Amino acid sequence: VKESWVRPASLRGLFALPLMVAITLGMASVGAAHVLAQGVPSAAAGPPGTGLAWGNNSDGELGDGTNNGSSTPIAVDLPAGTTITAIAAGTAYGLALTSAGTVLAWGDNSAGQLGDGTTTDSSTPVTVDLPAGTTITAVAAGDRHSLALTSTGTMLAWGENFIGQLGDGTTTRRSTPVAVDLPAGTTVTAVAAGDRHSLALTSADTVLAWGDNSAGQLGDGTTTDRDTPVAVDLPAGTTITTVAAGAYHSLAVTSADTMLAWGYNIFGQLGDGTTTDRDTPVAVDLPAGTTITTVSGGARHTLAVTSADTMLAWGHNNFGQLGDGTTTDKSTPVAVNLPTGTTITTASAGAFHSLAVTSTGTMLAWGYNALGQVGDGTTATRRRTPVAVDLPTGTTITAAAAGNRHSLAIAPSTSTTTLQVTPPNPEPDQPVTFTATVTCTGSTPTGTVTFHDGTATLDTEPLSGNPTAILRVTRLTPGTHSIHARYNGDSNCPSSTSNPTTVTVPKPTIPVTGTSLPTILTAGSLLTLTGAALILAHRRRPAHGA
C-alpha cells in the first residue's frame, strides 16, 4: 500500500486533493497457440486454461464428476487453482498436462491408463503418479495406454501393454508410469499414440515406433509387433517435423512440406490414391502447392490443416467425418466444406468425428454425433459438413482433442478485476483508496495491478492473498480524472484492462488565513473582508498634495 500525489493533466500545479474510485476490469484472454496433433485418440496444446468436455460419459470421460453425457460443452472438474496447457483424448478417458508440469487423468481406467496406481475408473481428474522430480512437457493418449514426454527428452508410458505399446521391453500392463526403453543417446521432442502403437519424433528428426504392427503402422518394413522402439524406414534424406497416429496408421510431415503415411489403408486413410496397406512410408497425394502445418489421425480417416488455413481430409467417410458433404470414402485428400471466410488453426480427428478450431476461437465439428460428440446441442446421427460447437457465452478455444465418442477442449484463462471506490463521490478534503480485487478462471492470480490516470501511471501495487491490490492517493487535484487499472497477468492468468472510469473532484472553497478572519470564505465573510480592505486602503492613502 502506497500513497502518492495525483493531479489531472488539465490542472497540473493546482490544489492536490485525495480521491477513491471503483473500477471493473474487462475480460481478456491469451491468444491461440499451435496444436500438436496426435493420433486417435488425440492430443492438443494451448495456453493455460480450463477444460471443457462433451459427448459420451459412461466411463466418466467428461471429467465432470458424473456419468451423464452432454451434447454441449461442460466444464471438466479440475482441482482448484489448476490450469492446463495440453489435453489428450483416449478412447474413453482424458489426460491433461498442467501448468506445473504434472498430469491429470480421468475416465476409463480398466488397464491402468489413468496412471494413479489403480484400475478404478474416475469421473473427476486424478493425479498421475509420476516419478519424483519429473516434469512433463507433452502427453498423448491411445486406446487404453498413455504416453508422456519429460523435460529431459525421455519418455514415460502406462496402461495397456499386451502388444508392447508401452515400449518398456515387456507386455505387462502398468498402472503407474514406466520408462520407455529408448535407444541410447536418444532425445524425444514429440509423441503420438495410436490405438495400440506409439510414435516418437527425435531431436535428430527421425521417428521411432513400437507396439502393434499388424498393418505395418510401425513403418519398419515388417508386420512384426515390437515391445521396444524401432526406427521408421524413412526415405533417404527425409527430415520429419511433425508426427501423428491414427488407430492403425501413422502420419508425418517433412521439412520439405510433403507428407508421409503408412499402416492400415483399407479406407484410403493413407491418402496415396490406393487402399493398400503400407509397411513403410509413402507420400500422401497432396494437391499441388499445398503445405501442411497440422495433421491428425482418426480411427480410419485423416485431417490436415494447410498453410492457407484451409483443411483437407481423406479416408473413411461413413458418418461424414471428412466434412465434404458426402459419405463417400476418399483415398486422396479433399477439401473440408468450411463456412465462407473461416480460417482454421488446429484440427483433431476422433474415431468417427472431427473437430476444428478457428482463428477467432470458435469451434467446428462434424461426423458421427449419436452421443453428442459434435457438441451442437443435438444427437443428430451424422453431420456431413461442419457445424458450430455450442460453446458457453464468451468462451474461446485454443486447443481441441477428439476421442472415440467424446471431445475435449482448452478454454484459455480470463481475468476480471473489480475496483472499489471509497467514498464513491469524494469531497476535496477526503482521502481516496483504490482497492482492486482480481479473479481468474482456473487459477489464483498473482502479480501486480497498475493504476492509471489517463496516460499517466499512478503506481503499481502487488496482489495480496485475497487477491487484492491497494493504492491510497493523498494528492488527487480538483478536476476530472480518467481512471483505469490493469492487472499485469502471470504465467497462468492473462492481463486485462478496465474501461476508463471518470471521477470528478469539485474545486474547494478558497481558504484565507489570519487571526481574526474566517478560514473559509462565505458570502458574509467576503463582505467583511472587502470592507476591511477598503478601510485599510483609506487609512494608508497619502494626504492630498503630499
What is the predicted function of each stretch?
Residues 2-412:
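Eukaryote-biased RCC1-like beta-propeller repeat architecture
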Residues 412-546:
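Solvent-exposed beta-strand/loop surfaces, strongest in extracytoplasmic domains of secreted
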